[in-house]
Amino acid sequence: MPKMKTKSGAAKRFLKTATGFKHKHAFKSHILTKMSTKRKRQLRGSSLLHPSDVAKVARMLRVR
């Protein structure tokens, strides 16, 4: 049986850390003129994945 491949799209978007999976915020790429400065500031940086999604992402990345 060959090795299972990781989902390359998920590998580009998520990073495994000691406390969970790190990811960037969505809705921050283009057409930002309509968005308020406060909202753009809140979407800056990265955050940890919600606990309910951890199992799905771990399966996609083949992480135990």
Swiss-Prot record:
Q: Which Gene3D superfamilies match?
A: 4.10.410.60
Record GO terms (molecular function)? structural constituent of ribosome
Q: Which GO terms describe its biological process?
A: translation
4Fe-4S listed as a keyword: no
Q: Does the keyword Hydrolase apply?
A: no
A GO cellular component term found in this entry reads: cytosolic large ribosomal subunit
Out of the domains of life, which is the source?
A: Bacteria
Q: Which UniProt keywords apply?
A: Ribonucleoprotein, Ribosomal protein
**PROSITE patterns per the UniProt record, alphabetical:** RIBOSOMAL_L35 (PS00936)
Could you tell me which Pfam families the record lists for this protein?
Ribosomal_L35p
InterPro entries, alphabetized: Ribosomal_bL35, Ribosomal_bL35-like, Ribosomal_bL35_CS, Ribosomal_bL35_sf
Q: What family does the Swiss-Prot or TrEMBL record give for this protein?
A: Belongs to the bacterial ribosomal protein bL35 family.
Q: What is this protein called?
A: Large ribosomal subunit protein bL35
To which species is this protein native? Pseudomonas putida (strain W619)
